Each structure stands twice: as structure tokens, then as C-alpha cells.
Amino acid sequence: MQLEFLGTGAGSPGKFRNVTSVALKLLDESNEVWLFDCGEATQHQILKTNIKPRKIDKIFITHLHGDHIFGLPGFLSSRSNQGGSEELTIFGPTGIKDFVMTSLRISESKLSYRIKFVEIAQEGVLFEDQNYIVNVAELDHRIKSYGFRVKEKDHPGELLVDKLKELAIPSGPIYGQIKQGKEVTLDDGRVINGQDFIGKPQPGRVVTVLGDTRQTPNIELLAKDADALVHESTFGKQEGSLARNYYHSTNIQAAKIAKQANARQLLLTHISARYTGKLSKQLESDAKEIFSNSKVVRDFDIIDIPLP
């Protein structure tokens, strides 16, 4: 599991940062990539990575400001032109379907795959399959903005092979039945319960990705015990009043939330173009004074999220 940042800037593309987009790469786990936001030129950024557009089968849109969605029509068209045929699901605020379909209709773009739209109607569970569960909650921005909490389901415990060998239970297909937790009758007549030979489940990982927001209690709920918290940092520590007036956050506010939520790492993004060079480093060092595992991410940074 990895996060790859395709755009880390705020508002408009800059010389050093493109507008917002981050990929959650689940290639080893489920051979797919999820995209969070798709700002202008996201498809150009993808060309500079090893991400294959056809592997992206889910896109989560935090809110409908242009720096988070203007790249969608182009990406969707290119995915089709490059042979993408698998269905793609777009999750987002009410209006995302209208934006996408209007763009495709007016440009007379034809796609080779089906798009499924899930417009967010309420907070809570947004998506669930056998591997993951995604919760969504509303944030505090000038328009509807959301945060997403991706929870990987727990991994089954390992088969306790040494314990089986101690009881002279021979290896073979029977181990597969035992690992499934089944009750098994051995050739010698012994009956064993597979549950007794399975270790404790390994907790799944949690990734929290937030849209633009002022501080709100929902952030801590989404970020609780997260292995990675992706939080906007449009402003620095001296600009709290500006952040509030413009419905954004500072690096210090993000760091305090990460600490309160017991997150493992804080990844600061949505960085204003005013913060370059030393000023960008200062954003990070100020955040680290409160939450030591803070990082101001740059375009194309890749963050590994190992199992606990």
C-alpha cells in the first residue's frame, strides 16, 4: 500500500506544484489504484509515474472546486483512448455526475467503459467490499467538502505450523482446511478445531484523505489511529485568521489534529505557491514541533504504508 502524490498545490498550478490529486496504490493488495481528486493536468502527472490509467477503478472527489476536478474529463477520455474497458466508479458531492457528463457531452467524447456515479447523500459508510471499507464525513469549507477514511479489513492470522507439528499433524492439503478455521478429522481419528491453530488477526491499515477544510470535529473522527493522514496546509502558523476566513487550515492546526487523533504520520498538502524553498521547510519544521512525524509532501512523493 502506497500513496503517490500527483499534485500538492493550492488553487492554481504552479512552477513546482500541480493542483490536487493523490493516488492510493493497492497493487499488491488488490491490483487496483484509487484516485483522490483530479485537478487540472492530473493525466500529465500520471505520465511521469508508473501508474496505468486502466488500473484506476475508483475516483473519490472531495469537493467541486476547480482545482480538484478540472482534470477529470481529460483523464477519463485518455483512459478510454488507452484501451481502458473496466467500469470506473466516481464518488463525490452532488453535482459531480452533471459536471462529468456535461463535459463529455459537449466535447462529444465517447468512452469505452461505463462510469458509475455515487453522489454522497449522507455521512457514514460510502463503500465496502471484501478488502476495504470507506467512511465519509462532511468537513467545513465554502462549499460541500468531504473527508474519506479508508480502512483495510484485518488480515487473517497466520497458520501456527509449529503447533501443528508438535501434535504430529502432517503437512498437506489438510493445512488449507485448518487455516480456514474448519473442524477437521485426522486419519488417526483425532478431531481438531482449526481455530485453535490460527494466530491473531493482523490489523488492517487506515488512510485518511481530507478535502479543503477549516477545523471541525469530524476531522479527528476520520483521522483516529490513521496510519497516514493527508491534511491540507494552505497557510502557515501565523495565518490562522486567514485560514479561518478562507475556510482552510494551517500546518499547526493539522499537526494538533494528528496528535489528538493518534495518527502515525501527517502528510501536509494543498500548499500555497507562496511557500517555496525555506518557507516550505519552515512549514514542516513548525508542524514537527507539535507532531514529530509530519512531512510537507511534494509532487511525485511516494509514501509507503507498511502493515503495523
Curated annotation (Swiss-Prot):
SUPFAM superfamilies: Metallo-hydrolase/oxidoreductase. Its EC number is 3.1.26.11. It is an enzyme of class 3 (hydrolase). Its cofactor is Zn(2+). The active site is at 67 (proton acceptor). Binds 2 Zn(2+) ions. Zn(2+) 2 binds at residues 67-68, 212, 270. Keywords: Endonuclease, Hydrolase, Metal-binding, Nuclease, tRNA processing, Zinc. It catalyses: Endonucleolytic cleavage of RNA, removing extra 3' nucleotides from tRNA precursor, generating 3' termini of tRNAs. A 3'-hydroxy group is left at the tRNA terminus and a 5'-phosphoryl group is left at the trailer molecule. The keyword Transferase does not apply. Zn(2+) 1 binds at residues 63, 65, 141, 212. One of its GO terms (molecular function) is zinc ion binding. Zinc phosphodiesterase, which displays some tRNA 3'-processing endonuclease activity. Probably involved in tRNA maturation, by removing a 3'-trailer from precursor tRNA. Belongs to the RNase Z family. Homodimer. PANTHER family: ZINC PHOSPHODIESTERASE ELAC PROTEIN 1. This is Ribonuclease Z. It comes from Pediococcus pentosaceus (strain ATCC 25745 / CCUG 21536 / LMG 10740 / 183-1w). The gene is rnz.
